[in-house]
Regions:
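Alpha-helix initiation/capping motif
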Residues: 72, 106-107
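Short aromatic-hydrophobic micro-motifs that form the base-stacking/packing surface
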Residues: 4-6
Length: 128
């Protein structure tokens, strides 16, 4: 009836997150549950950069807004996903999210990402 896809690059994943995601899935009208993480800084104050290295505000209307006054934004944690199989296969997609802590998430695409995952792991689990 349901499936969980756990990504191999999620070494900080906790069983509790999977359980919370499952409970959210079965007790909601969502077809999928995605763990999400809050961006550490409001993306509405983000910059873009052109090929000459010149930077510009992606949203210039927020250039003078204090960061603490801007709405939070979230990104996929890249750890796991829950799906109701029949709705997923039929394309009837309605996603719900569960928020997970930034210190337990690390996207791993580069060697530097792996080093950050090791640092977070030591911070969370190594006593000494």
């Amino acid at each position: 009836d349901n499936m969980c896809c756990i990504l191999a690059t999620s070494p900080l994943l906790l069983n509790e997150d999977i359980v919370v995601g499952y409970e959210r899935l079965i007790h909601s009208d969502f077809s999928s549950i995605v763990p999400i993480v809050q961006f550490s800084y409001p993306i509405l104050r983000s910059y873009g950069m052109n090929s000459e290295g010149e930077i510009y505000f992606n949203w210039p209307e927020y250039a003078k807004t204090r960061s603490q006054d801007l709405e939070s934004a979230y990104h996929d944690s890249g750890t796991f996903y829950w799906h109701k199989i029949d709705r997923w296969l039929s394309g009837d997609i309605k996603r719900g999210g569960i928020v997970v802590d930034e210190d337990r998430v690390q996207d791993i695409d580069t060697e530097q990402d792996w080093k950050m995952a090791e640092i977070k792991y030591k911070m969370l689990y190594v006593r000494g």
